[in-house]
Structures are given as C-alpha cells and as structure tokens.
C-alpha cells in the first residue's frame, strides 16, 4: 500500500476541505480519467482496491496512472481508553481529494472507451467520493487542427 517513506512530523491536524482542486485537475498522461465530484479522504487501501479492480479488468491491455498519493496520517486512540493523555498513534494514510481532482488515468493503444469506462466504473465502487468518467477525444483535436489549416487556405484563396 502507498505511504510516504519519511515525513517531517508523525502527526497532522485534520484540516478542512474547501474549494475546488487547482492542481491535478487536467488529464496529463492517458486518454481516459476518473475525476472527483465531491471532497473527501481516500485511504491507501481504497486506492489499492480501485487499482486492483481496474488492472484485473483491463488485464494487460493498457496502462494505469494513479494521480493521488496518501500523504496525510490519520491517528486513532485505542478502544475503551479515557480522554486525555495525548493524541493517538497514526493508524493509516489518506489522500485529501477536492472536487475536480483527477484520481486515476488510463491509456494505451489497446484500450477502447468502453473498456476504460467499465474499468473506471469498477474502481468507482471502491471509492468514498462521487466521481465521473472523462476522456480526451484525439479525433476532435486533429479535426480542429485540420479545419484551421483549411480555413487559412480558403482565406488565402479569397485574397488571390
């Protein structure tokens, strides 16, 4: 499971989740992605369960990128202990997720949109935040570039 190799401090405050994600909110590596709609904490176990679900579905077809990392320690007190006597020990690690954050990306030549959508749907069930499937349509980018070239040619023809 994911966790930092070393940290400056063992324990952290809980903090609050306000606003939307300003970093990590665009697709950087693959063609398809899972984007968070809510805010919440995603544990290292949930990230691993989602990764396994996607990997098992796509088999050896493509590649998966995990765009979040659990770097926040969550502490817990032992059961049936009295109040006081300090903060509990770190039990697990979480990634703080804000709306708009890309959680997972998927790509590869063998991956179709239907395959990616189904794999991401399986991963969605393992996560505590509401998510949506997004994709980059390569054909639209190519066609828009071709249209700009064609429009430049037509403008030159009109000038002559």
From Swiss-Prot:
Source species, domain of life: Bacteria
Q: Which keywords annotate this record?
A: Ribonucleoprotein, Ribosomal protein, RNA-binding, rRNA-binding, tRNA-binding
Record flagged with keyword Ribonucleoprotein: yes
Do you know which Pfam families this protein is assigned to? Ribosomal_L16
The biological process GO terms on file are: translation
Indicate whether Chloroplast appears among the record's keywords. Answer: no
Give an example GO molecular function.
tRNA binding
Gene Ontology cellular component list:
ribonucleoprotein complex; ribosome
Q: Which family does it belong to?
A: Belongs to the universal ribosomal protein uL16 family.
The UniProt function text for this chain reads: Binds 23S rRNA and is also seen to make contacts with the A and possibly P site tRNAs.
> What binding partners and quaternary form does the record give?
Part of the 50S ribosomal subunit.
The protein's name in its UniProt record: Large ribosomal subunit protein uL16
Which organism does this sequence originate in?
Answer: Prochlorococcus marinus (strain MIT 9301)
